[in-house]
Amino acid sequence: GGPFQCNLRTLVYGGGPMYLADLEVALETFGERLAQIYGQGESPMTITALSKARHAERGHPRYLERLASVGTPHCVVEVAVRGEDGRALAPGGIGEVCVRGDVVMSGYWNDPAATAAALRDGWLWTGDLGAFDEDGFLTLKDRSKDLIVSGGSNVYPREVEEVLLTHPAVAEASVVGRADREWGEVVVAFVVPRGTAPPVAELDRLCLDHIARFKRPREYRFVDRLPRNHYGKVVKTELRKELAGG
């Protein structure tokens, strides 16, 4: 037991969601060697960072909240969370993460329409939804295109996935919306079981104990694997296509 011993000093992670359940396992395995960087190709590796020192602050009263964040803004950029009207939101407000600085791209090659959509008034609109806390730590909620609107209420898939992954029989989970005549969209969870698939009633109970009832999946689909791209990210468009095809 305990972290393994080696000459490895730092292990940097990023490029996709790091679920809290997985991060806690990584800390148990590697010790306090972990650091996180959040960036995009349009603003490479320079939006926020969560340092090794922050990973080691186990005694802090908001340790788990900070661990679930992507850290604080890098010194070379300005970062803001903005609403649909373009105004910066106060701490706690969920909106789109926007970045400004010399490292931000000047535009997409030969694609003025995409450039105009992404760059507005000098700010890069990243397509990521998130919120700052009072101490300047940024927590990502989801990609804006993956947001589920059910009965007029927003459901952030990652919040549901985080809960499902706490079940010992769930190895992986990915949540998407399915079109619904009554609700607009309903929540569907694709689950890769660890061995035998867990009873749906257990997953329902787990969700009801941790999140609002309207966020609970209406359907669970147990699969052998989730579709991923060459970066290892889950391709949710493929999951939505599967639902659309029945």
Regions inferred by a protein language model and the residue ranges of each:
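Conserved ATP/PPi-binding loop(s) of AMP-dependent carboxylate-activating enzymes
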Residues: A56, S69-V76, E84-A117, V155
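Gly/Ser/Thr-rich phosphate-binding loop
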Residues: G1-L64, E78, D85-A88
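Beta-strand->loop->alpha-helix junctions that form or flank phosphate-binding loops
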Residues: A35-E42, G71-P73, V176-R178, R221
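Core-facing hydrophobic residues within beta-strands of well-ordered domains
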Residues: Q5-L8, V170, P217
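Generic short beta-strand
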Residues: L64, E78-V79, L129, R225
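AMP-binding/adenylate-forming catalytic core of the ANL superfamily
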Residues: G101, S106-G107, A117, L129-K215, ...
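Active-site glycine-centered loops adjacent to acidic/histidine catalytic or metal-binding residues
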Residues: G15, G39, G71, D128, ...
